[in-house]
A protein has these predicted regions:
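Beta-propeller-forming repeat regions
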Residues: 1-240
């Protein structure tokens, strides 16, 4: 199982790198994209982080029976510490490149390893905030704000069902970042919500827009598809 892949310049050499979770290996891998990517032998896999399945913290919410003990997923890119280099966010952690093919790992929430991840400036000033939500299961959506060397957790949505689509964007163009998320359930979920939470720049979300209801979206994207300057949603149905 390889769930979640992400590209970015994580080592600061000006070239695009690839990171991915390999749940079968219980490892997050980093690799530089070779000049000839067709040949398998040109790829050098560098372990960033390895987890183990002999125990886990009590996790937020409830999960399907097929979830493995201490399974990690979710990936996002952001400059978390403001040093100008892109960092990796995922599995309730964030990872910083140290040089010489080494990374540090930094815990955000050890009780939310099996989650979708995103990061952005939801509170003006300071480090970007991190948002985690359950991708498979029922659990809250949390925002984490860096305060006094601690990731302070704030509940944003009390209960999300399989929120496998998640992003931070400025949807309404007011300069404050917003959260977009969409739910899904195998077999279909009549209450599945595709929703924008409109931010106020202070970590609050006083207004929301429900874009659709009853349409299950799996790992979908929000992006300007037609070049008209506003954001569109590319949805992948998940109701089979």
């Amino acid at each position: 199982k390889v769930h979640d892949q992400l590209t970015g310049d994580f080592d600061g050499d000006g070239k695009t790198d690839l990171v991915f979770w390999a749940q079968g290996d219980q490892t997050l891998y980093f690799t530089r994209i070779p000049a000839d990517p067709v040949l398998t032998e040109n790829w050098k896999l560098i372990p960033v982080y390895k987890y183990y399945n002999d125990s886990q913290m009590e996790q937020h919410g409830t999960y399907p029976a097929w979830k493995r003990t201490n399974e990690h997923e979710g990936l996002a890119v952001a400059d978390i510490d403001g040093d100008g280099l892109q960092d990796i966010v995922g599995g309730g952690l964030w990872f910083k490149y140290l040089g010489a093919d080494k990374f540090s790992y930094n815990v955000v929430d050890g009780a939310y390893t099996f989650s979708r991840s995103t990061a952005g400036q939801l509170v003006i000033g300071g480090r970007p905030e991190i948002v985690l939500v359950v991708g498979d299961g029922l659990a809250p959506m949390y925002m984490y704000e860096y305060q006094k060397n601690t990731w302070a957790r704030k509940e944003i949505v009390p209960k999300v069902s399989n929120g496998h689509s998640l992003a931070i964007v400025d949807f309404d163009g007011d300069g404050n970042m917003d959260i977009w998320y969409a739910e899904m359930t195998l077999g279909g979920y009549a209450e599945a919500v595709n929703r924008i939470l409109l931010g106020d720049g202070a970590g609050n979300f006083p207004r929301d827009i429900v874009i659709s209801k009853g349409i299950d979206l799996h790992d979908s994207e929000i992006v300007d598809l037609d070049g008209d300057g506003d954001l569109d949603i590319l949805g992948k149905p998940y109701d089979g």
